[in-house]
Swiss-Prot record:
Species this protein is from: Erwinia tasmaniensis (strain DSM 17950 / CFBP 7177 / CIP 109463 / NCPPB 4357 / Et1/99)
Protein name as it appears in the record: HTH-type transcriptional regulator ArgP
InterPro entries: ArgP (IPR017685), ArgP_gammaproteobact (IPR023490), LTTR (IPR050176), LysR_subst-bd (IPR005119), Tscrpt_reg_HTH_LysR (IPR000847), WH-like_DNA-bd_sf (IPR036388), WH_DNA-bd_sf (IPR036390)
DNA-binding positions: 21-40
NCBIfam families per record: argP, PRK03635.1, PRK13348.1
Gene: argP
Amino acid sequence: MKRPDYRTLQALDAVIRERGFERAAQKLCITQSAVSQRIKQLENMFGQPLLVRTVPPRPTEQGQKLLALLHQVELLEEEWLGDDNSGTTPLLLSLAVNADSLATWLLPALKTVLTDSPVRLNIQVEDETRTQERLRRGEVVGAVSIQPQPLPSCLVDRLGALDYLFVGSKEFAARYFPNGVTRSALLKAPAVAFDHLDDMHQAFLQQNFDLSPGSVPCHIVNSSEAFVQLARQGTTCCMIPHLQIERELAEGELIDLTPGLLQRRMLYWHRFSPESRLMRKVTDALLAHGHRVLRQDTA
């Protein structure tokens, strides 16, 4: 069995984090040539490239797996160090999270962890249908996903559901839906999606109004918070988590355009096994807060 030297793995990790060999060498306090030699040593050990030498460099699939191993080991070392680690370099905590969770419940859930533990948080925003792939590739150590089944050597727990409402402003409703939300009216009503793979709005319209994909005009905006702003200013209708717009609904800035109809996304917390002390803190925090603010009754 090939057992990599973790010093050489740290060189690979530094090149990725620092986006180049020169800055990686400065970070590790060694020469650029030494960084190259350590990575070449790793590549010779595994008989394949571990780094795509682009600008910035990026890891190959095997490189991703090795980096995932390194990040797991770094977290597990915290078990042995205990709590007496003040003054040490904060541990990197890379998580893959959907934008709507980040905009609503996730950061409050992590408040205690970020306050009490020496960590550097690295949030990678991805659609909830694809976050698990980042965990599979070793880019992160934990992921919020809609997938209920764990990956090999991983753990999973249910967090709860986000309920999405089809909303818009009163002015938008008066302009585009004077006779109610109908199939023909929806064909002219501007919508918004997070990216070209975000199909929530389209799935809602297809399920409830038999509208085929691509049949409605749709903006692309990579911001959950911008969805709220666009809806409030009367320029789009869109699917937004109820949790995110409770105030706007209560004050009448936004209205539920299709009362009784919603999209529900059950969320699950995935992470590598075994868990370090830090990851158990993260798990406990996410589950406790998720069970408080996310919908648990899925009937």
